[in-house]
């Protein structure tokens, strides 16, 4: 599996985007103005993928071009639907796949949806939605940052300010 980490500039901020990929993207990590966050989150993503794929991954650093896909999605050069063609979904649960597809196809740039609204649409609990959103391995492409709490729109892993930044880049303000 190839690990690619690139630095981009968005709204006077350094955005670090990392992808783990083969023919498609298996996972994405990002940070804003904090390259050490990427280094810290890489092992967590690898561990998640190894558990889901039930195998030890051999990671090599290289250039896959997939960080560019994530960046272009972030700045609106390509849609989430177009970018989603590049992600590997075979290891997702049926529920995760359903939720992530819904987000990609229905919650567009500049829009948000609450956990409760999404739960109602998917006929499940807000807690189930929250858990699946939190473990989303494809942030930015699968726009989990567009799912907000009714009382606090900026709850987010890894950091609330990341969610605020992503939503502002997309033109949404609370």
From Swiss-Prot:
Involved in the cellular defense against the biological effects of O6-methylguanine (O6-MeG) and O4-methylthymine (O4-MeT) in DNA. Repairs the methylated nucleobase in DNA by stoichiometrically transferring the methyl group to a cysteine residue in the enzyme. This is a suicide reaction: the enzyme is irreversibly inactivated. It comes from the Archaea. Its EC number is 2.1.1.63. Keywords: Cytoplasm, DNA damage, DNA repair, Methyltransferase, Transferase. It comes from Pyrococcus furiosus (strain ATCC 43587 / DSM 3638 / JCM 8422 / Vc1). InterPro entries: MethylDNA_cys_MeTrfase_AS, MethylDNA_cys_MeTrfase_DNA-bd, MethylDNA_cys_MeTrfase_DNAb, MGMT, MGMT_N, MGMT_N_sf, WH-like_DNA-bd_sf. GO terms for cellular component: cytoplasm. Its main location: cytoplasm. The keyword Ligase does not apply. The keyword Mitochondrion does not apply. One of its GO terms (molecular function) is methylated-DNA-[protein]-cysteine S-methyltransferase activity. It catalyses: a 6-O-methyl-2'-deoxyguanosine in DNA + L-cysteinyl-[protein] = S-methyl-L-cysteinyl-[protein] + a 2'-deoxyguanosine in DNA; a 4-O-methyl-thymidine in DNA + L-cysteinyl-[protein] = a thymidine in DNA + S-methyl-L-cysteinyl-[protein]. It is found in: Cytoplasm. This is Methylated-DNA--protein-cysteine methyltransferase. It holds the Pfam family MGMT_N. The gene is ogt. The active site is at residue 144. Belongs to the MGMT family. It is an enzyme of class 2 (transferase). This enzyme catalyzes only one turnover and therefore is not strictly catalytic. According to one definition, an enzyme is a biocatalyst that acts repeatedly and over many reaction cycles. One of its GO terms (biological process) is methylation.
């Amino acid at each position: 599996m190839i690990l690619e980490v690139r630095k981009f500039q968005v709204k006077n901020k350094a955005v670090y985007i990392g992808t783990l990929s083969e023919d498609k993207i298996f996972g994405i990590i990002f940070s804003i103005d904090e390259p050490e966050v990427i280094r810290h989150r890489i092992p967590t993503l690898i561990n998640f993928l190894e558990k889901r794929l039930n195998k030890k991954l051999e990671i090599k650093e290289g250039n896959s071009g997939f960080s560019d896909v994530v960046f272009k999605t972030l700045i609106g050069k390509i849609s989430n639907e177009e970018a989603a063609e590049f992600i590997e979904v075979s290891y997702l649960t049926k529920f995760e796949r359903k939720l992530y597809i819904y987000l990609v196809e229905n919650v567009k740039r500049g829009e948000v949806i609450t956990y409760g609204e999404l739960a109602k649409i998917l006929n499940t609990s807000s807690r189930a939605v929250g858990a699946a959103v939190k473990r989303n391995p494809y942030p930015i492409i699968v726009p989990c940052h567009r799912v907000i709490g009714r009382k606090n729109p900026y709850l987010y892993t890894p950091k609330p300010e990341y969610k605020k930044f992503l939503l502002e880049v997309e033109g949404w303000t609370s």
